[in-house]
Amino acid sequence: MSKRLLILEDGTIFEGEALGANLDVTGELVFNTGMTGYQESITDQSYNGQILTFTYPIVGNYGVNRDDYESIHPTCKAVVVHEAARRPSNWRMQMSFDEFLKSKNIPGITGVDTRAITKIVREHGTMKASLVQARDEVDHQMSQLQATVLPTNQVETSSTATAYPSPNTGRKVVVVDFGLKHSILRELSKRECNLTVVPYNTSAKEILEMEPDGVMLTNGPGDPTDVPEAIEMIKEVQGKIPIFGICLGHQLFSLANGATTYKMKFGHRGFNHAVREVATGRIDFTSQNHGYAVSSENLPEDLMITHVEINDNSVEGVRHKYFPAFSVQFHPDAAPGPHDASYLFDDFMDLMDNFKK
């Protein structure tokens, strides 16, 4: 295998072996602590523009299959692993991890100390990084990295460009796609919801004209303040139709009601984040993937905190006191991860049914 370098913004350089597509890329370096679920993570649009480091020591041992995609066209910049499995085996497997990365034009690096990389990010925060072929001109590559300005509003490249239906016989739900995970559609479809998926910039007028029973605000990448049109849409829709927001949808719903958001030092990315429900004390283990959070300081009077993360006490869920609307920062759809919080989809069904009475 040819050699590659992972160059960090702080000047640290890791050398390893090439994996996946033959590309030089620059992105935001983040880490995921999950032990499995690499296919779902890489195809999660929330990683748009990011270099994804897996902390688990071996990745790819069960290959890649046709069922576990969260999106067909992944947008993460690159992947970093300590060891890529060379002899994967699973009855569902269609291709190896390396073949999958090549098919999706995603470069990677293996044979590096991913726990050392994670420690740097934990101590210094997320930072820019470049994955390049090992050459002599490292100083030039470093200067290029320092000069690179990462793009904003990744939602634009993660959302569907046109509306499309996913028909069923039950409640009519408009799903606003900010970087939709397929597992959200699966959870709604299991409950027989008649779905229409719309682009992120769909207006409130267009949504209201569809006369839905509810609106789902999905997950997605980046800074929620980069999507002002969605914030305005939520302001106009709430109170007229029940709303359920997940991940980025949670942040946008909170901003629409006067809350503020902030960039976290290194975010929550993994499948074992413990979340406490404030009202009952119930603890759920959740799947999370976000670098921004809703601030608990000066939270608007109209919102109440429903869930908090037990390690850093960050806001993990809010509910509107007067409108039929709530949101959570974690992924109740899991995929991958625990299904402790899947009951929230049932709460959304009840919210729509009660609103119609």
Curated annotation (Swiss-Prot):
Keywords linked to the UniProt accession: Amino-acid biosynthesis, Arginine biosynthesis, ATP-binding, Glutamine amidotransferase, Ligase, Nucleotide-binding, Pyrimidine biosynthesis
Pfam families: CPSase_sm_chain (PF00988), GATase (PF00117)
Binding site for L-glutamine: 46, 220, 222, 248, 251, 289, 291-292
Location of the Glutamine amidotransferase type-1 domain: 172-357
Start and end residues of each stretch annotated as CPSase: 1-168
Catalytic residues of the enzyme: 247, 331, 333
InterPro entries in UniProt: Anth_synth/Amidotransfase, CarbamoylP_synth_ssu, CarbamoylP_synth_ssu_N, CarbP_synth_ssu_N_sf, Class_I_gatase-like, CPSase_GATase1, GATASE
One GO-annotated biological process of the protein: glutamine metabolic process
Disulfide bonds: none
The protein's enzyme class: ligase
SMART domains: CPSase_sm_chain
Protein name as annotated: Carbamoyl phosphate synthase small chain
Species this protein is from: Lactococcus lactis subsp. cremoris (strain MG1363)
Name of the gene: carA
